[in-house]
Amino acid sequence: MNKRLSALVGMLLLMLGLPCARAGLVNDIPSCYAASHFSFSSPLPNRLLYVLIDQATPLSPALQKSVIDNINHALGPATKFVIAEFSRTSNSHYLQVLHTGIIESPMTPSERSNVPVNALGGFDNCMRDQAFFAIHMADTTAQQILQAATGAPNQPNDILLALKTVAPVIAQDPARQKVLFLVSNGFENSSFAHFASGNLNPEQMLQQARTQGLLANFGGAQVFVLGAGITP
């Protein structure tokens, strides 16, 4: 691996170990195409994985592992991922995007044929390292959120508002395949509803959510939920 690509790997390692003020706002994974100074770049990702974790839903170690396994299964080339958390608690901890990353697409055969042979090895190594560090970043971030989760029957939690907030971001993303992976027990506890009270009329609550504009449109994204119904 040449010095330039070695520096990229070092940068990735540094990013995994240190907090970044801009983390989550931009792509936190440096580009192998840019590092190689090619005249072309990787196309936009055709897949989006948006992981949204409810900090008011503590999970067992087995379910935490299931979250990580599902993330790993969904990540691959040409994939953009977002790791975010939410929970309105006593310290005003609302929705926060912790990391956004892109695993780039490999070069097409036509592109490879126009790249000097001595540059291909370094690029291929960089792409392997990029995928490894992207998965490691997603896993570590998700694990930190899961391990810090706390739950209590009266803990404030605006699940519908969190979903409403991320919906436009997901809907407007140009990826052809979009997935929202929600980790939550689904117990809304806000000015809108208090599931712990046990006195809810589902049809009435659905109508109220519609009236208050709390129903989210994810633009055709698939939505998967892990943890539904788990009590704190």
Describe each PLM feature range:
Residues 1-9:
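Bacterial N-terminal signal peptides that target proteins for export
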Residues 9-17:
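Bacterial N-terminal signal peptides
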Residues 18-23:
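Sec/Tat signal peptide C-region and signal peptidase I cleavage site
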Residues 24, 28-32, 45-176, 179-181, 188:
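Von Willebrand factor
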Residues 27, 187-232:
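VWA/integrin I-like adhesion module and closely mimicked acidic/polar interface patches used
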Residues 43-57, 141-150, 224-229:
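Acidic/histidine-rich, surface-exposed loop or edge segments in extracytoplasmic proteins
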Residues 63-71, 163-165, 203-211:
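N-terminal post-signal-peptidase region of extra-cytosolic proteins
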